[in-house]
């Protein structure tokens, strides 16, 4: 189930938030107080978040996690702290949670909105002018297929000061070991990425590096000519025109991704 390389998925944000007491990097309570009554706070969780998007009559819980990134992600605004959260109001399809944005201003935090489904796991902040950039690894498992990618998180400010996020996919990968027992390529298609990991700042401004396991044209040609041994254990039946690439027979390299030109090149 390959996806277009350059996909832009806009995630709507909702809910107004209140300003908080003094901001503290080492404590979640001041952050939680921006959208939660004190009586509803327990450790890093709020049992009833105010202004949660599409909550209706539900009492939506929000539990802040350790994944968080700070930077000036809106050129005209103050620095933002972007924090992952878990919520029982979100399903597997929306990653069981999302991210919440806090504006850092005058030693205080102001909640600027929730982004259900938009998690900031394994990210890197690229400092720059007029604003910083946030690039993240993404991942979603469905029916044994692990889809991953490298995405640039694009922040926008609405008329009501809420912050919106758009996830701009720069590179995608598909690992089908869980569905077929091995990775799979389509013989009439081009190179395919299987996995992406270990994102870091790149060697030049506005670039990132990521480790990749992939099949190039040579690998696909050999797989389709049955030049690889059969995987030890397979599941289901391949579609006509597909072929296995057993574990250990994929190519490995580090890719450099330019966030401006969107060009992807192997390192070296």
Say what each PLM segment does.
Residues 24-50, 142-268:
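Acidic, small-residue rich beta-repeat scaffolds with periodic aromatic anchors
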Residues 84-93, 103-106, 138-142, 209-222:
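Short, flexible beta-strand-to-coil junctions
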Residues 72-86, 127-140, 152, 198, ...:
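Acidic/hydrophobic-patterned starts of short beta strands in beta-sheet-rich repeat architectures
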